[in-house]
Amino acid sequence: MWKFNKKLARLTYRLYSSSGPSSPLHGKKKLPQNLKFVVLNPTQSGLVKNDQKQPRHRPSKKRSHKETGDNNLDFGSKLLVFEKQNSLDSALNSIRLKKPTSASLPSLEYNALLQSLTSSYNRYQLREFISTHQPDSSSHLTHWKKSKLSQYIIEKIWNCQPISTPTTPTGIKSTSLTFQFDSPREIFLLLITQNGKILTNFNKLGLTFIISIQDNELTVKGSPSLLKYAEISLNKIWSNITHENVRMYSLMPSKDVINLIQKETHTFFEYLPDLQMYKISALSTKKISMAKVFLLNAVASNPNTTQHHHTIASPALKTELYPFNNTLENLDWLNKSQDWARLQSVVPKNCTDLMTPTENATPELTDAQVSQFESSLSKNIPSLSPSDSISQSLSITLGHSLQSASFSSIFQPLIHKSFISKLLNLPMYKESSSSAVPVPVPLDQHLITNAHQSFIQLNFTPVPPTSGSSSSPFLQIWFEIDEFDNIVTTSMRPLLKLQENSVILRTPQCQTDYKITSDYIQDLLPDFDQTNPDAWLSEQKGLQEFLLKSHWKLNKYQNLMKKINISLPDNLIQQYQLTDVLTHRVLNLRFPTNTAQDDKYIIQYSDISRGFLNNGSYRQLDFINVNPSETSLKTFINDVLSF
């Protein structure tokens, strides 16, 4: 028993005592008429610290079982005990069933049985099985390995011995099974499907596979019972192979591209020269559909796209190609398999000043170069007409101009770390309040407060027509994503890429290259009108079907319609195939200028995630000219180069 705290009792009595108005305790709660004592434990009364552990009262298990009248409440724990007690019996019975019917085993069957016992059971189960047959032998089995225990079971308990397997005149053992094919299709699908998981599972059973690529021959070695199982299983797998012929309308893809598609989609391609077609084979129709998308994505080239390269560097500057190391994180599936390099300046070893003027000097453009850029960006441009919803977009993207060993070149968007510090102090761009002076808020605070916008971009490639006609423009469909990662279907914007001209500026003396892009796009739909929603898709039945039949879940691209029919402005119906899906998280920042017109440029920071065909993500920084007609191209380029 703990001692009564007299000081605490006197203080309680004073607080609850009856006092007059002149008392210093006036207004306190009075002591109740029927005084009752509340017994506190040592912790509640403050006599024991909170960190001191007190013994807890735990009721007896026997008492708790007596108080519960329903025995079914503890039925689950009894089931667990029952299962635990019988797990060893199940293992012993499983080992007992593996006993061969014959005492003489071929060497392959003996090795397969030995491997099965070693890999399927632990040492305790094997020792207990031996103890059930030889109780006196358990003492010297404690430190034996599983392989030795398994061998002891086969030879000492089951009295089985390995014998040499007779061979045929051809040299092939009698415990083997040979499959002969006309093409390497069946063997190739076994090797590539699920990265060879099918053959790996067979190998775990004790089967050995010998493949002859020149003869299209597959030989399986093992015990007779396992060979029978392998024969039935392999024939069942090969019976699921489906085929589809795909006609090629454009240039034939290279052999490397075909091999890459086969690897990515687990399919097999056979070229039929008489029909000018590819015969695609796979173990499922979904893999064939995916292979067709990869093939279309690889061979389809946009005829409405032009690209020119210009190197801006001093003739005295020495440049070399340096390897690009971020291929896995940034490049897509088609370019990821190649080695890329960027043109960079070379600093002499005897140079003591690392911050040389040549490296950090802003590239200077001449009027002749700017005139050449304008000529390249204005090729094949359509006539701008507000009635046709055709608009122009002029932007400059930061990145690297890369070259491969085959002299092909690409531009990969990339943000160098030297630009991050400049972005952190830029204010956010707000179109509604462009005239007001914004309060600068750092970039990281924008991202934390969820000030960015999210979009999903669906890229569609026109399916080649059966008759020779003019090529249709590529299609992009954009959707907004709300704060709950739900796609807002009423924000759909289908855009036709009428023309895309770009000029890539290679600047070896700088940390990044620049891509100047002039886009001409046409919007196929007006803005959604809530007062008249039926008129929104009245002229685009294909888009209406696309919205109704697609199940919109972010990162669940298999639920989208892969093909849609679009009514083009020239009253033609064109079928499009979905080839890629990109997710954008966009943040618009204001470009710092010293002029009164402070809203002529927008800096767009994008975090882009690939999906559908590609994996990975990359970050992109674009400088967008809001009014290309009001700002000259030379001024725009010089402003971006001096950023």
Swiss-Prot record:
Major localization class: mitochondrion
Keyword match Protein biosynthesis: yes
Compartments in which it is found: Mitochondrion inner membrane
InterPro entries: SLS1_C, Sls1_KH-1, SLS1_KH2, SLS1_N
Biased composition (Basic residues): 55-65
Region (Disordered): 43-72
One Gene Ontology cellular component annotation held by this UniProt entry: membrane
A Gene Ontology BP annotation from the UniProt entry: aerobic respiration
Keywords: Membrane, Mitochondrion, Mitochondrion inner membrane, Protein biosynthesis, Transit peptide
Taxonomy, superkingdom: Eukaryota
UniProt key word Mitochondrion: yes
Extra information: Present with 3430 molecules/cell in log phase SD medium.
Functional summary from the UniProt entry: Involved in aerobic respiration where it is required for assembly of respiratory chain enzyme complexes III and IV. Also has a role in mitochondrial gene expression. May be part of a mitochondrial membrane-associated RNA-shuttling system, delivering NAM1-associated transcripts to the translation machinery.
Record-stated family: Belongs to the SLS1 family.
Protein's recorded name: Sigma-like sequence protein 1, mitochondrial
Species of provenance: Saccharomyces cerevisiae (strain ATCC 204508 / S288c) (Baker's yeast)
Source lineage: Eukaryota, Fungi, Dikarya, Ascomycota, Saccharomycotina
